[in-house]
């Protein structure tokens, strides 16, 4: 009897195949949170928030106007990372590209919301920047981007479940590597 180990979905054990999907989520979260976290606090620092409040637009329109440009920029970034990953590193997207973009859009909404929350509770742009990094650093180490969640202590596994990047990475790796969707 000969025992052979078979690696599914990444038989060459290529690190690019594992890292490129994770990089999409990391870049999305990093940029979206940092950019959005300064959106409202910048207006407060410049004392223009009062002018925005008295305009005839509704609060929802104000928030949408603040985050929509960042959402468009981030969707372009997703396309760029996918293009570089596919053309430069040879990582093939085995699943549905439309599903991948839809999931990226949902994840983008959550990261923009986190950035907006940071922006509304911060008093200065520097404080918003620090709070953004406070949320980003655990995401890098606990989300499964670098270390497998199964190898983490139970307490960190619980923490990983509340981080949006964890769930995004599972889905995106499923779409790109396994061909889900």
Stretches found by the model and what they are:
Residues 26, 30-31, 42, 74, ...:
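Transmembrane alpha-helical core positions of polytopic small-molecule transporters
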Residues 126-143:
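Pore- or pathway-lining transmembrane helices of multi-pass membrane proteins that form conduits
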Residues 9-12, 92, 143-181:
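Membrane-interfacial helix-loop-helix junctions in multi-pass membrane proteins
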Residues 25, 106, 126, 157-160:
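Alpha-helical transmembrane segments of integral membrane proteins
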Residues 66, 122, 133, 163, ...:
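Active-site proximal loops enriched in glycine and acidic residues that flank catalytic Cys/His/Asp
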């Amino acid at each position: 009897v000969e025992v052979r180990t078979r690696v599914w979905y990444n038989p060459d054990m290529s690190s690019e195949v594992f890292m490129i999907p994770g990089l999409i989520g990391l870049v999305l979260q990093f940029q979206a949170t940092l950019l959005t976290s300064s959106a409202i606090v910048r207006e407060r620092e410049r004392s223009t928030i009062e002018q925005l409040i008295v305009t005839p637009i509704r609060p929802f329109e104000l928030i949408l106007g603040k985050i929509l440009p960042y959402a468009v920029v981030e969707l372009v970034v997703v396309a760029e990372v996918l293009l570089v990953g596919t053309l430069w590193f040879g990582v093939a997207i085995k699943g549905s590209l439309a599903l991948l973009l839809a999931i990226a859009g949902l994840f983008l909404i959550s990261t923009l919301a986190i950035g907006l929350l940071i922006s509304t509770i911060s008093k200065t742009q520097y404080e918003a920047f620090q709070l953004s990094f406070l949320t980003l650093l655990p995401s890098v180490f606990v989300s499964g981007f670098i270390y497998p969640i199964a190898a983490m202590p139970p307490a960190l596994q619980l923490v990983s479940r509340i981080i949006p990047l964890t769930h995004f990475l599972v889905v995106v790796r499923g779409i790109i590597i396994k061909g889900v969707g």
